[in-house]
UniProtKB/Swiss-Prot annotation:
It is an enzyme of class 2 (transferase). Involved in the regulation of the intracellular balance of NAD and NADP, and is a key enzyme in the biosynthesis of NADP. Catalyzes specifically the phosphorylation on 2'-hydroxyl of the adenosine moiety of NAD to yield NADP. It is found in: Cytoplasm. NAD(+) binds at D73, G74, N147, E148, H158, R175, D177, T188, A189, Y190, S191, L192, S193, Q247. It comes from Edwardsiella ictaluri (strain 93-146). GO terms for biological process: NAD metabolic process; NADP biosynthetic process. Its EC number is 2.7.1.23. Disulfide bonds: none annotated. Its cofactor is a divalent metal cation. One of its GO terms (molecular function) is metal ion binding. It comes from the Bacteria. One of its GO terms (cellular component) is cytoplasm. It holds the Pfam family NAD_kinase. This is NAD kinase.
Amino acid sequence: MNKRFESIGLVGHPRHPAALATHEMLFHWLTGKGYPVIVERQIARDLKLQHALTGTLADIGQQADLAVVVGGDGNMLGAARILARYDVDVIGVNRGNLGFLTDLDPDNAKQQLSCVLEGEYSRERRFLLEVKVCRDGQMHRRSTAINEVVLHPGKVAHMIEFEVYINDTFAFSQRSDGLIISTPTGSTAYSLSAGGPILAPTLDAIALVPMFPHTLSARPLVIDSNSKIHLRFSHFSNELEISCDSQIALPIQQGEEVIVQRSPFYLSLIHPKDYSYFNTLSSKLGWSKKLF
């Protein structure tokens, strides 16, 4: 029997009235059922919830058993990078487009969430990536990503020359527009658009996907998730960047190198009891239906 949730966090950055209305509906419904609810501060201000318990994402991670993220996958990614540092489960209400990470239908959210609160759910642990920008062995900048870490030019598109080492062994060099380093969670995001493979979320694997390589032989490469990926660069005159989930940018300067490896943190993702990963793929990607 799954554990029951005792305290709930409400998270999101609503961009339109419908998403804000979902936050308001969930707040009043959850408090009406007797749950302690901690609301992300900006949402509480937008809804004028003067007497609500409010806090930052870190506060929610420390105090809540379950964080409910209302929005699209972008909202989920932004919240989950922080919430993954804490012992808190996360579930999403889809107010975006595709919604690979946000399972709950906003029109049916109360019924679905009610079943989850009664212990009818499944839990998945999704690993994160950690990226470090280093010089002479010293770490200068770092971040984490749930979907992908992407090497790309800065403001102007141009070819990049770089070498890739895996577990300190030279793997390949490349001239391309960049490189996508994707988790299984991110394999249905940017990586998929670049021709990368879809990795089932239970796989302990990382995909390296070239972006417009200047050779016909370059292909996506799938490696063990415990591998350490080291990117080294020839001299470059234009800016390079590392982006994490298309939300955080780390500049790369001359003489710096990049190390990407599996983070010690996990996103604890909650799904409704009837969730099916392959049904989600089929519906989101428009795959053909069963023939018989």
